[in-house]
Design a protein with these regions (language model features):
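General secondary-structure edge motif
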Residues: 2-3, 13, 40
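Detector for methionine-enriched segments
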Residues: 1, 16-17, 33, 54
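Major-groove DNA-recognition helix of helix-turn-helix-type DNA-binding domains
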Residues: 25-54, 59-62, 67-68
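Short intrinsically disordered terminal tails
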Residues: 1-3, 66-70
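Polyanion-binding surface elements
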Residues: 6-32
Length: 70
């Protein structure tokens, strides 16, 4: 694979996604998604890749299933 090659993997097949991608996928506003991440620092569904915040999709889905409001 070359340096500039990008894989096009559907959101539902991804293990992790960026905050922006998660906001689109879960139909949550970007600012609200950032707020949720900030409120839950250290949650198991958050992974820090350097300074980039990644959301573990399946774990976030499980957390979201248990919420009555966000």
């Amino acid at each position: 694979m070359t340096k500039n090659t990008k894989l096009n993997i559907a959101f539902y097949d991804r293990y992790m996604m960026t905050v922006e991608e998660a906001a689109v996928y879960f139909h949550i506003g970007y600012k609200k998604m950032r707020s949720i991440v900030k409120e839950h620092e250290g949650a198991k569904w958050i992974l820090y890749n350097g300074n980039r915040i990644m959301i573990k999709r399946e774990q976030f889905e499980k957390w979201l299933d248990n919420q009555s409001a966000i």
